[in-house]
Amino acid sequence: MKQLYTVISLLFLFTHTAWAQQHEIFNQRIRTLQVVGGTNWLSLPVSSLGGEPIHIDFDDMTHDYHRYRYKIEHCDANWNVTSSLFESDYMRGFNDNQIIEDAEQSINTNHPYTHYHLAIPNADCQLTMSGNYRLTVYDDNAENEEEGKMFTACWMITEPQPLVKLKLEATSTTDIDIQKDHQQLKMELDHSQLRITHPNQLNIVVLQNGRWDNAVINPKPDYLSAGKMNWQHVRALIFDAGNEYRKFEFLDTDHPTMGIDAIDWDGSDYQVKVMTDSPRPNYVYDEAAKGSFYIRNSDNVENNNTCEYAQIHFTLKAPKLPGDVYLNADWTYGRFLPEYRMEYDEMTKTYHARLFMKQGYYSYQYLMKMEDGSIRLLPSEGNFYQTQNKYNVLVYYRAQSDRTDRLVGYGELK
């Protein structure tokens, strides 16, 4: 028993810096990439072996059909491609030169586009191993593979039946403050079905609102018992409470809907102004999704190929801040790119950004990137213990006979 405790303790001394489950777009023709497990667009793209399919949707901003082929790779817990596996180890069917056949052109839209859809599993390939997966899409007509690389999409597959049991609880009583600015995540993990003899066999990832920029990797438990680990007062699991995400719905090109101040037509584009976001000195409950988005219009029929694209204008009223201010949400794919960075107007004391976006419901927040690369909440956004944050926990395990990490447990606390 003492030897087991030593192994478990050593496990949480290992740190990882490359962890990231982030989609990435390489070609500006690609817009509105969505990866959803089943129909649960409000959560991480997670499904189980034999469970609901993973849906990948995206738009190509042309009206021409492109032969898009895809390749699926299994990744370890650190999101590195598992080179020690054969494709037959994690997949049945074919993985080379598979074409995305489900495509439909937009109908009566100002900006023509072609919508593509892919579901995994499908008739050509079925996944047979739990863990992390990365799909890369290529334009088959490109001169070479690097030029034809369009985007990558990531998702997670759990075991058909969890091999661990997770209990999660969030409290506003923390070692930093009580019912003020922070939340403490408490966890209990029952791993009695697993045989752990080496510190690298178990990896635990904790996310707040699906964000990977502040992910906590392998937090050290403060209680160990036979087959169980407990995190009750772990400093690493104290999170800034933040505030509820902001939101808007752009559903109609003629009439402003929720969160929209004005819609104008300039002869070539719809210019949509989101209501100015002002400082929030007090907490106000709001059921906004935690960065999620959902494509639809007021008719809510054939949303994939009838929704318009428009220039969406964001305005944030705030003093000049010491770091760069970014829009952050699932639809920014966790990336701090120039297109999501806001510019400051000294005359109006406001930040501004303009993005080319498709009709739908969007939730978002503002984050600040400091010169040292650290990410912080904006002081003007508020920090309140009552905030309804979402916490996700991923538990990876590699048995002695395994050549990669499997996802043996997944928990979500809303």
Annotate each PLM feature.
Residues 197-283:
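Long, internal scaffold/assembly segments composed of regular secondary structure
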Residues 110-140:
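Ligand-binding face of N-terminal immunoglobulin V-set domains in extracellular IgSF glycoproteins
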Residues 77-79, 125, 139-150, 211-212, ...:
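Short acidic/polar inter-strand loop motif in beta-rich domains
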Residues 1-22:
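Bacterial Sec-dependent N-terminal signal peptides
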Residues 28-76, 177-189, 299-314:
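Contiguous beta-strand segments within globular domains
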Residues 91-116, 212-219, 224, 311-359, ...:
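Aromatic-rich carbohydrate-binding modules that target alpha-glucans
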Residues 272-321, 405-414:
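Basic K/R-rich, polyanion-interacting modules in nucleoproteins and related proteins
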Residues 157-180, 385-408:
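Low-complexity, Pro/Ser/Thr- and charge-rich linker/hinge segments at domain boundaries
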